[in-house]
Amino acid sequence: MIRIFFILLFFPLISFSQVNVKGTTKSKTENVFFANIIFKNANNTIFTTASNQNAEFTITLNPGVYQIKSSYIGYFDFVKEIKITSDTTLNILFEEETKQLSEVVVRAAPQKITEASVVRTVRNSSVVSDGLSIEFIKKTPDRNVGDALKRVNGVTIQNDKFVLVRGLSDRYNSAILNKTLLPSTEPDRRAFSFDIIPTALIDNIIVSKSSSANQPGDWSGGLVQITTKEVSDNFFNLSLGSGFGSVSTFRGFKIVPSTKFPSTFPSTHQYRISGNGDKRLFTKQFDNPLETTFQSTPNLNGGLSFGYTKGKFNSLFSSTIRNSFILNNIERKDYQSSTELAYNYKDILYTKRFSTNGLLNLTYLGENRYSWKTLVNYQTDDTYLTRSGDNFDNVQNVLSNSSNHINNVVINSQFDGKIKTWDFNLGYNFIFREQPDYRVNPITKSLGVNEPYTTAWRDTYRFWSVMDENSFNGNINKSFGNIKVGGGYLKKIRGFNARIFRYLSTDMLDEITNNTDRYTADFDLGSLYSMYENEWGKWKLNTGVRGEYNLFNVNTADFSGQKVNVNREYLDILPSLNVSFNENKTKYRFSISKTLARPEFREVANFAYYDFVRNAQLLGNSKLEKSDIYNLDLKWEFYPKTGENISFSLFGKNFIRPIEQIVADGSVPSNLLLTYTNPDRAILYGVEFEFRKKITEWFDMYSNASVMNSEVNVNGVK
């Protein structure tokens, strides 16, 4: 293994007898993406390539004289003859086609963001990937990225917002917005909530499924890469829309208004040492709103966007607003044994969701390229859940309810540039998540007894929490022909604090906040990589190695108040190899790589979070360690026509010390306690199939399917 690693590490330094031709495809005002380029030698042998999503191309040829022809819709063909004797840089400059009718000049604009361009990106990519364009998404009812990701091969969406790729939970997947790694939006899991990004603000989504050295190392299932809108023309759009749901529209809806935590309420210690009389006075500071019932209206959404270009400067502003109602009927059961029920519940979950956001992109397209992109999003979810049924474990009839409110603010801002063979990115992320007054009201009576329902006061629950996270990142990359090197740094700082109460009577609260219900955390990650990429005829090779150094610190406490500092220090070497063979319309791929999964702040903090919907508490584990993952991919792709493809994939993954959520020892279904652990090993393998066919200009046929199997051994149990 060590010998193989050093071969991979120094492979980029090997030289070959052929020469490399690289360059860009541009017009006078903008980059031209995915342009076709044909090289014909003296023997009339043809070699083809295409520029990528950065308007760059590279090809390996034998020395000689070549006729070059490059074309793209909306531009005159670029034709030139050159003599190639050594490594050569060829910058292709297109001239726009114009058709003059009297005094009107019509310019044909080059298409971007199309399904054909995404298929071409996937085809030309060095790694195994799948994707969607905004052209395709517009033909669906999808209004946010969470909805759209359901249509990507091998991707499943949980709770309408969390992504599972190839059967791996959200904690094994990562997300990038433009070029910035997105943080977790959740206090109780490592996950990004994709429903907060509207599809109206994006150009495309690419999901990488195999790794290369220039990608982050902390993922295994999929790396979701979201590209926000860019503009090349002046435009103004205003849209209004409405949606009707047979289950949720014009139905009786229930919501309990949220309440802010009183600003003059005493600290945990001061409240606990107060007498009962003072506690009753303090309790009166809390609003105690009752549920309100109203008739839901149709979902409403609106959008405003405009773009402005002048010379080499482009600007884009876009904003959307959406108000929606969701109603879910849920059956929830758990068993004490294979045949004996622990409980049998019927839930009705009402969700009222409001979101608004804004996107501002400023771009300069000269000899060098610079852009500043900022996305601001605010979303609030108000939920009310009613639960009825039987709890056989506690011998009770249940008629309970809970209300929850979640406010999310996400700010993503980044500045990036490309200067000749250098490119860089500076980014900032801010996540704010507030949970004001999560309430649980357990109402029960004895099972099978004719008696009134009563509130179980000691099991009531009122919860307030605030989480904020700031992250800063920077990356720089440099190309030396077919060799690319780079490095980056990421800093994350998080704070979390919660206050928890229960009722002792109708007019007095008991604070049950623990020392574990707050933590601070910071995370430092430095990375360096070296990558080699080249083509020889029908073969393409991408190989390299990435090194990541990570410092990880979580400051919390145990139940006694004793400080608990969780410190981790990791140095990881992550090699990768991607090989493809392209024959006419068919492409074969092979990929092998090492990646990893680091514990999230929440997973190692001692904080215990009660989830009434799942009927469970979730507790962190301060002894949790990172997981090493070895990945293997084989893929066959066929491209019959532009924008069409058929593909079949085989994949396998071997996890060393996987991070798994388990039921804690001694836990029972009626009082479920979940935590995290590192089993010795796990494996995952499966197959994927995708079919994409364009029937007419307005009608596409698209289908995909995945079958997978996973095995994990926890304490001797598979």
Model-found features: residue ranges?
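Short, acidic, small-residue-rich periplasmic hinge/interaction motif at the N-terminus
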Residues: 26, 36-40, 71-73, 89-135, ...
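A short, solvent-exposed loop/turn motif at the edges and junctions
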Residues: 40-45, 69-80
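Short, acidic Ser/Thr/Gly-rich low-complexity loop/linker segments typical of extracellular
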Residues: 42-56
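Periplasmic N-terminal accessory/gating domains of Gram-negative outer-membrane beta-barrel systems
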Residues: 111, 120-164, 179-197, 201-213, ...
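Surface-exposed extracellular loop regions of Gram-negative outer-membrane beta-barrel proteins
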Residues: 180-181, 432-438, 446, 450, ...
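Transmembrane beta-barrel wall of Gram-negative outer-membrane proteins
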Residues: 285-385, 408-409, 415-418, 577
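Signature of Gram-negative outer-membrane beta-barrel scaffolds
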Residues: 459-461, 465, 481-584, 609-611, ...
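Outer membrane beta-barrel strand-and-loop segments of large Gram-negative receptors
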Residues: 471-478, 509-527, 619-621, 625, ...
